Amino acid sequence: MNGEAKRTRLDQRRAPIHEALENFRRMRVVPFDVPGHKRGRGNPELTAFLGQQCVGVDVNSMKPLDNLCHPVSVIREAEELAADAFGAAHAFLMVGGTTSSVQSMVLTACKRGDEIILPRNVHRSVLNALVLCGAVPVYVNPEVDNRLGISLGMKREQVAKAIAEHPNAVAVLVNNPTYYGICSDLRAIVKMAHEAGMLCLADEAHGTHFYFGNGLPVSAMAAGADMASVSMHKSGGSLTQSSLLLIGPNVHQGYVRQIINLTQTTSGSYLLMSSLDISRRNLALRGRQVFHQVADMAEYAREEINAVGGYYAFGKELCNGDSVFDFDTTKLSVHTLDIGLAGIEVYDILRDEYDIQIEFGDIGNILAYLSIGDRPQEIERLVSALAEIKRRYHTDGTGLLSQEYIDPVVAASPQEAFYAPKKSLPLRETEGMVCSEFVMCYPPGIPILAPGERITKEILNYIEYAKAKGCSMTGPEDPDILHLNVLA
């Protein structure tokens, strides 16, 4: 292919799925296929709610629109454009959220009995994948910031030690960044993994903007990682549940497609795919400018919130060259314990009394997620609300827990524990037993307990405290979490 043809094919102004849907809309095709709402005519209430523009392109795979399971035309073009925009060898459009991207990434790298090196503060989707494939986690317990009570990144020395002690591990997985914006030394970890013959996988659910930002942490593809799961819907502007799976040149594209097709729907949503296509175009053309503005807004918010007093909106000052190698300056994470309120309490007050919905609140912190749709006036409203909350609710904070992360005691693999014979016991009677299910606050979706981990008094205290403070707890069969399933 000559250079001119290549430039035309990779013209980032194009959005081939979007263009194909617009052409299809003009064709006025009579539908005798699914979906059964028939362009909205069969469900007028849905059409009134979502709009004709939306339901009119909620269509099934067909020749002019390609097929997500085996793309050969417009979806293939959209994937090539995404790969070009993100600096990847190939990109896969994912419609099962970044959960499906992460699981496909782990299932590609690991088989039953394989070891994978990873931090324990991973999203539940990583551990779910281990339940499915039977791989065995080798945890690198992250450093903890004792003031903030949050887990940090993996230290280079810890990763090197894990690789040396587990030379047959097949991969190292890295959060880039964590929910709080903390980044490990990704380039160094990639180098260590590759020198040991291992893949390096990156969970970039919260790092889409790294590919389009000046002064932001390094992206996984730029660092040489082999695979990366990217939540376009979080900071990239696409619809919820849409995601990208990026791979480097040393990963077999065809095999990854087979892995994806094991679990991803055969009825890919064109609403989600076109949103990925349009959002990729937007980021490729305007992303650097937009995310520079987002970082500026976040920095302004940090300064204003810290000026209120009592709160600590943290940033790059946490960087220490290792466990906090870099920090995502678009993240607005705020420590709340010094005003005497848990993060989840501030979260609830903001929503219930000020009509401000932030991303999450945990034991000691809140996160306000800033991205391409935010404006300065919303920042001012958030800062004013936090100042008023401090004035109205400030207390001495006696009895507040401060630690968000508890080192696990692993007694069995996730798959072994999940499928083993089990029994249900009252919460306080489970101390010392091995858990067979997940327990987590969502968001952020990082398990407090995972299958195969021993239940300690410290963990039980944390669960009861989080419940009492109003954290949304998920995972166990018992929705009230009065009982837990343990190995029989």
Per-range role (PLM):
Residues Y300-G475:
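Conserved C-terminal alpha-helix-loop-beta "cap" of PLP-dependent enzymes
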Residues M1-S73, P444:
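N-terminal "arm"/small-domain region of PLP-dependent enzymes with the aminotransferase-like
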Residues V55-G97:
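Conserved N-terminal alpha-helix of the aminotransferase class I/II PLP-enzyme fold
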Residues L148-H209:
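Active-site phosphate-binding strand-loop segment of PLP-dependent enzymes
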